[in-house]
C-alpha cells in the first residue's frame, strides 16, 4: 500500500447527509475505516472534511490541505495545516511521515489526485443508504481503475480498485 483513497457512498451515490459522511456510513464501513487507519503513516484530508468530520483526534499525523490559515481541528497535536495543492501535500507528507498515505478527503481532492495518477488504490464502501447529498456516479469511479474486487459485509459492498 502506498497512496490509498477511501470513500463511502450510499447506494444512490450520496457522499454525505447533513454535511457529514457519517450519514451514509454503516457499522461495517466504520469497522473497515478504523482498521484501514491503523496501517498508514499519515492521513490527508481537505479543509471542508476537517470542518465537517470528527478529526479532533487521529492515530497518525493528519495533513489538512486548505487555503485557510485557521486550523479547524485545534487540539489535535498531530494535525498539520498546509496551504498547497493536494499533489504537493501528498509528496510532502510522503517525505515527512512515510509512504503509506490514506486520503480521506472529499470527492474533489480524491478525483483530482486520481486524475493526476497519484492514487494507487481506491477503497470504496457502498452502503444501503439513499437520499443523501452530493451524489456521484460510483460505478463510473470504479471504472476509472483497471482491476477491482468486491465483497459484501452485512449489506455494505466493499470495492478495492487498483490500476
Q: What annotation goes with each model-predicted range?
A:
Residues 1-163:
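Enzymes that bind and transform nitrogen-containing heteroaromatic metabolites
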